UniProtKB/Swiss-Prot annotation:
Catalyzes the NADPH-dependent reduction of glutamyl-tRNA(Glu) to glutamate 1-semialdehyde (GSA). The gene is hemA. Homodimer. GO terms for biological process: protoporphyrinogen IX biosynthetic process from glutamate. Gene3D superfamilies: Glutamyl-tRNA reductase, N-terminal domain, NAD(P)-binding Rossmann-like Domain. This is Glutamyl-tRNA reductase. NCBIfam families: hemA (TIGR01035). Substrate binds at residues 57-60, 113, 118-120, 124. InterPro entries: 4pyrrol_synth_GluRdtase, 4pyrrol_synth_GluRdtase_dimer, 4pyrrol_synth_GluRdtase_N, GluRdtase_CS, GluRdtase_dimer_dom_sf, GluRdtase_N_sf, NAD(P)-bd_dom_sf, Shikm_DH/Glu-tRNA_Rdtase.
Amino acid sequence: MENNTIPKHNTFYAIGLNYKKADAEIRGKFSIDAQSKSNLLQQAKTEGIESLIVTSTCNRTEIYGFAQHPFQLIKLLCENSKGTVEDFQKVAYVYKNQEAISHLFKVGTGLDSQILGDFEIISQIKIAFTESKALDLANSFMERLVNSVIQASKRIKTDTDISSGATSVSFASVQYIMKNVANIGEKNILLFGTGKIGRNTCENLVKHSKNEHITLINRTKDKAEKLAGKLNLIVKDYADLHIELQKADVLVVATGAQNPTIDKAILNLKKPLLILDLSIPKNVNSDVNELENVTLVHLDDLSQITDETLEKRKLHIPAAEAIIEEIKNEFSSWMNGRKYAPTIHALKAKLNTIKEKELIFQRKKLSNFDEEQAELISNRIIQKITNHFANHLKDEETMVDESIDYINKIFQL
C-alpha cells in the first residue's frame, strides 16, 4: 500500500531558543545570517532531512522540521551558528508533534512575540518556507501548516484588536528617545545600518519627532539612499562614520552584523550620546559604557517598556486563541485525512478483490446468476463498509494511528 503521509519513523519537531530564557548574548551566538541559513538548508538536504524551515530574528532562532531524533536538528543549528550544544541545553526548548504545531501557531500569530501582537515574525516564516521550498525541503504537511498559520495570523489581525495601537520594538525605541532626549526635533540623529527594525524606527522617528537632522549610513550606500529617498533624509558614506558620530546626539545601530560595529575606540565624543542597539547579535561593544557621556540601551531593555496599549492588547488574547484553535482543528482534520486516506483506499481495493473472487465462484455455481444485480449489491455493501471505517477515523475521539494499525492487520493491507 502506497503511503503519501508523514513518514512513520519521523517526528515533527520545533527546536530553538527565544527571549524568554536566552539573553541577547546567547541569542547572538545562535543567530543565523543569510549565508549560514543557506549552508544549513544544504546540509539538511545532504543529511536526508525531509522537510524543515529555519527562522532567525532578534528575538528567536528556531527550526521546525522532521527528524528521527531532535538532535539531528539541534546539530544543524549548532554547526551553522556560534552556539554550542551545551549552551542550547541550558536555554532552549524542544517540542514535538502537536506541541510543535501549537508553538508555531503562537509564534506566527504574535502571541509569543516579545511585544504582544507584534506580527513581524509572520513575514520571516513566509520567507523561511519559500527558501525551503526552493530546495525541495518543504513537504505537503509543512506547506499546509505554514498556510494555516498565515491564515490564523490574518484572521487575528483582522478580527481582533490584539495588534491595535503603535506598539513594537521600533515604536518603543522612538518612545524612549522622545522621553529621554529634550528638544528632539533639534538634535542630530544618526541611523547606522538599515535592517528592518532600523528602517521602522527611522520611519517612526520622522513621523513623531518632526526632526530634519536624521542621517543614514550603511555599508551598502544604495540601501540607505533608497530609504532616505522615501523619507527625505541625509545619506553619508560609510567612510564618514567617525565624523558623523562626533556630530550625533542619538545613534541608532541596526547593522545586523555578526560582530560589534561600534566600540569605544571609534567614539571620539565631544558631547553626550544616546546609543540604541537594535541588533542581535549585539552590534555595540559593551566597552562604550566606560565612556562617561554615553548611554547605551539595548533592544531587550526597550522590549520591557509596557504601556496602556499592551495592557489593552492582553484583553484580546482569548479571542485570538479561539481563532487559533479553530484553524488548528481544520489542520488536524486535514492531517488525519492524509493519514487514513491510503488505508481507506487500500481497504476498498481489498474488499473489491474479495468481491471479484466471490462473484467468480457464484458464476460457476449458479446457472441463473444475475451478474448486474450482484455487482450492484456488492458495490453498495463495500461503500457502506468503507464509509463506516472512514467515519470512525474522522471521529475526534478516535486514536487514528492505532485504528489504522488494526485495520491494516485485520484486512492484511
